[in-house]
């Protein structure tokens, strides 16, 4: 059964990277060496004989709203950014920085916002599970260069911003299957923070 959600424009095609590893014993490593690597196709190919139905919908994705940042979450973000800056100065993180893997929610938004505001931290890439609201703004500001994830968990206004400026975002966001976004081999290879 295929769902065709007409609320999502066809112009979003190209943001996806569908990769299916080979079966053992010939399976190789997942060939992601930087977050922006595209290793698969932008769609799933299915034998037409296997399709039993197409369900048409026209429903935008619904994402619960996060509370606004408060003094505590802002301070957590500032502390994490200051810690990572100190680690760079001490040489434990390269001067070019490393990709970020963030969680989702207010604290993750606070940390990402603080990283974006800290001018001692260079523009960075993300290899994460969830791409959320703060990432959209940081991309527009040039602070996040690229984000790889398995979902866009953004509010309606941010999703509309992505859709309205798809030519800008299509080359800066890739959506992958969860087994690729959360793969420990890839996370270790990239040196995710």
Model-derived features: positions:
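Conserved phosphate- and dinucleotide-binding cores of soluble alpha/beta proteins
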Residues: 1-99, 106-193
């Amino acid at each position: 059964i295929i769902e065709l959600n007409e609320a999502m424009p066809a112009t979003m095609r190209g943001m996806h990277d569908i990769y299916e590893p080979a079966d053992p014993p010939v399976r190789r490593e997942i060939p992601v060496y930087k977050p922006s690597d595209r290793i698969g196709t932008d769609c799933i190919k299915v034998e037409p004989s296997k399709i039993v139905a197409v369900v048409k919908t026209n429903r935008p994705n619904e994402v619960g709203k996060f509370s606004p940042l408060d003094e505590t979450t802002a301070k957590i973000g500032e502390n994490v950014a200051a810690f990572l800056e100190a680690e760079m100065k001490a040489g434990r993180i390269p001067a070019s920085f490393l990709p970020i893997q963030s969680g989702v929610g207010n604290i993750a938004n606070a940390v990402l916002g603080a990283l974006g505001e800290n001018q001692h931290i260079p523009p960075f890439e993300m290899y994460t599970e969830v791409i959320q609201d703060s990432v959209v703004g940081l991309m527009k500001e040039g602070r996040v260069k690229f984000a790889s994830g398995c979902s866009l968990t953004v509010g309606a206004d941010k999703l509309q911003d992505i859709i309205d400026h798809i030519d800008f975002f299509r080359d800066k966001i890739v959506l992958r299957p969860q087994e690729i976004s959360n793969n420990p081999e890839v996370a270790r290879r990239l040196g995710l923070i």
